[in-house]
């Protein structure tokens, strides 16, 4: 048996409690002598003075933890590794390979029937048709939680300005999320309070197949979140 943590911010402790769930899982694995590996983990930070951080560090240096790789924080990860108790490495995020993975599934009859997904086809831009930009909004407090002094109202103005910029450059657009309920709540807030056209908004992105098939139709992506940008890279779609 093997316990695998894959490609997620499970070390986060500043304003999320992932670290505690991770530590408890490691303790259970240690109790039952099950090896643990972490793959492509996001490393938020390291703080000697934080009890939460040191709680996580103590758990990570358990004998059952064999290997940890990170997608973005090798130097921070090294600080968690006391006496080289586990192997470490820098790797790409798994989403880099999303185009390869979903090219094998999107369009297959079983996927289409089960989820009602339109098979991804090569984009053909008809003469006179505008190129479309996917604009991925982030939850209202996403900036504040990450120590950026940016209110909900300022965030709304940001996205309204992005929309106007895209329109002024003669692009079509859609407002979309990668599935986080907080992002969808903020999208609803924009519709109700800032007259954002509901027909320009995409909800219920609850499966990776749905997200991939939707993004395959975009000619560009604007996103504050990590994974829409990484998926865009995988699909060779320009993104900012």
Question: Which sequence ranges carry the predicted segments?
Answer:
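Active-site anion-handling motifs in enzyme catalytic cores
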Residues: 1-240
């Amino acid at each position: 048996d093997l316990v695998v943590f894959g490609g997620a911010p499970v070390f986060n402790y500043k304003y999320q409690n992932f670290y505690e769930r991770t530590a408890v899982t490691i303790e259970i694995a240690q109790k039952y002598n099950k090896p643990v590996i972490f793959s492509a983990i996001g490393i938020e930070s390291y703080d000697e003075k934080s009890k939460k951080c040191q709680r996580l560090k103590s758990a990570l240096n358990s004998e059952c933890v064999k290997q940890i790789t990170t997608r973005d924080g090798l130097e921070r990860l090294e600080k968690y590794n006391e006496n080289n108790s586990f192997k470490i490495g820098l790797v790409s995020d798994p989403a880099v390979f999303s185009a390869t993975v979903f090219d094998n599934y999107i369009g297959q009859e079983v996927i289409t029937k089960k989820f009602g997904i339109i098979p991804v086809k090569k984009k053909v831009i008809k003469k006179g048709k505008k190129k479309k930009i996917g604009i991925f909004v982030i939850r209202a407090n996403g900036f504040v939680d990450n120590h950026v002094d940016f209110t909900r109202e300022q965030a709304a103005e940001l996205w309204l300005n992005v929309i106007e910029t895209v329109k002024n450059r003669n692009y079509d657009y859609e407002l979309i999320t990668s599935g986080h309920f907080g992002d969808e709540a903020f999208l609803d807030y924009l519709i109700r309070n800032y007259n954002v056209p509901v027909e320009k908004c995409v909800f219920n992105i609850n499966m990776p197949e749905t997200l991939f098939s939707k993004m395959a139709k975009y000619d560009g992506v604007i996103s504050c979140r990590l994974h829409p940008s990484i998926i865009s890279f995988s699909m060779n779609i320009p993104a900012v």
